[in-house]
Amino acid sequence: KVNLKNGPKVSNVMYGTFFGGDTAMKEFRNGFDGVFSTYIGYNGSHQVFNGNSLWQNGGTLGVTGTLYKGDWFGGWTIATGLSGVDANTMYGSENFGMWSIGTALKTGYNWELLNNKFIIQPHFIASYSLVDTFNYTNAAGLKIHSDPLSAVQLAPGLKFIGNLKDGWQPYLGVDFMWNIMDKTKFTAMDTSLPQLSVKPYIQYGIGVQKRWSERSTGYAQAMFRNIGRNGVIFSLGYRAAFGRGK
């Protein structure tokens, strides 16, 4: 659940899948290596609050560049998305569209201990998102207009990773998610509605990664959220390398 400032508690269920591809690792100057990636995904969600129900379905397209030097890494991604919303309210059914664009930077360091059997990874993510809803007329006949939602999120975190035999890597992680610029203005028939925003929250959980070879890895994890929002995220992933690239 998401506890909105100046608003209701929202029950939020999200789901989706992503597919992407990476280039071969490229060598740059001063000891840097890098890889470029593209990805496309489907995302859906269902929100319920105060007797209202919203279903969202859409897609995302993005690109990422990642640099490595020794135990340090840093990545930059940019993505855009388009979604359709089917809403059911006390006045009837409504349909409208949303679009978004966003970018994020992530950097971290792998501190290797006990002959690389244990890794402590401090990391930091900074992201910016711009989300806008197309103007529409709701089921009550009111014209709804909203300013674009402009959100910045800062997320420092810490990850503890174990290197076991046969390519197994169990890990624990914790992140603090802080939203510092996340208010938008809604108007209905030129009347301003209350501003809503998301409270900071903590995300923590466990996972495991399995490396079958240099070209094949998979993972499964469960992340829990508390304080500003409550819930759990389950995710699975698999990566395979093809061709002759490194």
Give the ranges of each region predicted by the language model:
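Solvent-exposed, glycine/polar-rich loop segments of beta-barrel outer-membrane systems
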Residues: 6-12, 50-57, 84-97, 130-152, ...
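Short, functional N-terminal and low-complexity linear motifs
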Residues: 29-33, 125-127, 201-206
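Short linear motifs in intrinsically disordered/low-complexity regions
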Residues: 4, 23, 116-117, 133, ...
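Outer membrane beta-barrel translocator domains of Type V secretion systems
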Residues: 1-119, 221-228, 233, 237
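Outer membrane beta-barrel transmembrane domains
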Residues: 62, 66, 143-246
